[in-house]
């Protein structure tokens, strides 16, 4: 009888362990994925990644809020934790800039801006084995599933010249800027007036 009970307990524990293993999230799921044709696969679940910052881009020629867009920046959790420990971005870092339309509501005292429909995402990837310049940039509309790397002049040059840490705009990420300064990886020179126009 004891043997049967022990066997039943062992089977129960084995089944539980197997189910936990299956349901556990893949710790490497935030790494970049590519097709066989070297296109980047659209990152899924990025809204559960680490949120870094938002910006509202306003068109000076627009009126009544037209042409304004929000940008929300997310970074892969594994890269974020490595940055907090070292002040630098590890290989296979992934950033997502989510672009959304803006809706404005005015009152006598304030003008409020709200995020609305998804326009698309821009993805920044550090992959030293795949890209000669280490970082590459990809553009997705609201439904695109894969994308080729953008031309060098489209994104890389601005990021390389204006990024405070490697090719990234850490100067605009208030939770990371002090860490980069502490580790000595922060390029203070990028904080000139030109950097604010990026």
Regions found by a protein language model. Give the residues of each.
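Generic detector of low-complexity/intrinsically disordered segments
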Residues: 8-9, 22, 42
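Sequence context surrounding c-type heme c attachment/ligation sites in exported
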Residues: 26-35, 40-50, 54-59, 86-198
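N-terminal post-signal-peptidase region of extra-cytosolic proteins
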Residues: 69-85, 107-109
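Bacterial N-terminal signal peptides
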Residues: 7-17
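N-terminal low-complexity, intrinsically disordered patches enriched in charged
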Residues: 17, 80-81, 101
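Signal peptide processing junction and immediate N-terminal pro/mature segment
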Residues: 18-26
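Positively charged n-region of N-terminal signal peptides that target proteins for export
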Residues: 1-5
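Secretory pathway targeting signatures of secreted, lumenal, and periplasmic proteins
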Residues: 50-74
